[in-house]
A protein has these predicted regions:
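Short hydrophobic beta-strand element within catalytic cores of glycosyltransferases
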Residues: 56-59, 74-77
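Nucleotide-activated donor-binding/catalytic signature segment of Leloir-type glycosyltransferases, i.e.
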Residues: 1-25
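C-terminal alpha-helical cap of glycosyltransferases
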Residues: 114-115, 119, 140-178
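Aromatic "clamp/platform" in nucleotide-sugar-dependent glycosyltransferases that forms part
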Residues: 39
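A short, glycine- and acidic-residue-rich donor-binding loop in the catalytic cores
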Residues: 44-49, 57, 64, 68
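A charged, aromatic-enriched C-terminal amphipathic alpha-helix characteristic of glycosyltransferases
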Residues: 100-111, 118-149
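Short alpha-helical donor nucleotide-sugar binding micro-motif in glycosyltransferases
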Residues: 26-31
C-alpha cells in the first residue's frame, strides 16, 4: 500500500514480512544491497545487522542510526526536516509523538543506488571491512550495556525514579532475536 502511494509498484520489488530469523539473516547475507531510506528511524536494528553481514547498506543520514552508521555504509542526504506533528503523511503519521520527519533527497538516493550498482565490487569490499568494526563495537553484550547506560541515565534525571537498574534486574535472551526484560 505504501509503495502504491508513491507509484513504486514494480515486480522486481519484493516485500518480505514475518520471515523466520534464519531466513532473515540469510537474506541479509546474500542480498546485494540493503536499503533503509526511512523518514524517521530509531536504532535501526536491521541496518546494523546488514552492515555486520558485510552487505553494502544505503540509509537516510538522520536519526539514531547515526550512532553506529556515521562514517560507514552509504548515507543518503536529507533534503528537509519537519516536526512529526505536522500530520501530512496520511495514515502513517505518528503525530502524537515528539520528534522530526526527515525527507531523503530522492535524487541523491537514485545517484547512490546507481553508483553502488556500477561500482559494486568496491562497495562490497568496503562493507566487508566495515562489518568487522561493526561486529567488534556492537555485539549483543555491548549494545545491552549501551541500553543499560541509557536507562540508568534516564532514571537518574527523574528524582522520583532515582534508582539505577542493577544487573540482576535484567534478563537478556537471544532466542528469536534480542530481548531485554527489566
Amino acid at each position: 500500500e505504501r509503495l502504491e502511494n508513491y507509484s513504486l509498484i514494480d515486480d522486481r520489488i519484493k516485500q518480505l514480512s514475518f520471515t523466520s530469523r534464519e531466513d532473515y539473516i540469510k537474506y541479509l547475507k546474500t542480498g546485494h544491497v540493503f536499503l533503509s531510506c526511512a523518514r524517521s528511524e530509531g536504532w535501526n536494528l536491521p541496518l546494523i545487522e546488514a552492515m555486520s553481514c558485510g552487505t553494502p547498506s544505503i540509509y537516510s543520514n538522520c536519526s539514531g542510526q547515526l550512532e553506529f552508521a556515521e562514517g560507514r555504509g552509504i548515507p543518503v542526504r536529507i533534503d528537509s526536516e519537519k516536526a512529526a506533528n505536522t500530520n501530512d503523511y496520511g495514515r502513517y503519521t505518528m503525530s502524537d509523538l515528539p520528534g522530526n520527519y526527515y525527507e531523503p533527497d530522492f535524487n541523491h538516493l537514485s545517484e547512490v543506488m546507481r553508483d553502488v550498482y556500477v561500482n559494486y565490487k568496491t562497495y562490497k569490499e568496503k562493507s566487508l571491512k566495515e562489518s568487522i568494526e561493526i561486529r567488534e563495537q556492537f555485539n549483543w553484550d555491548k549494545v545491552a550495556d549501551i541500553g543499560l547506560d541509557t536507562i540508568n541515565d534516564f532514571l537518574s534525571r527523574k528524582p522520583w525514579l532515582n534508582r539505577p537498574v542493577r544487573e540482576n534486574q535484567i534478563n537478556i535472551s537471544y532466542i528469536d532475536g534480542p530481548k531485554v526484560e527489566i
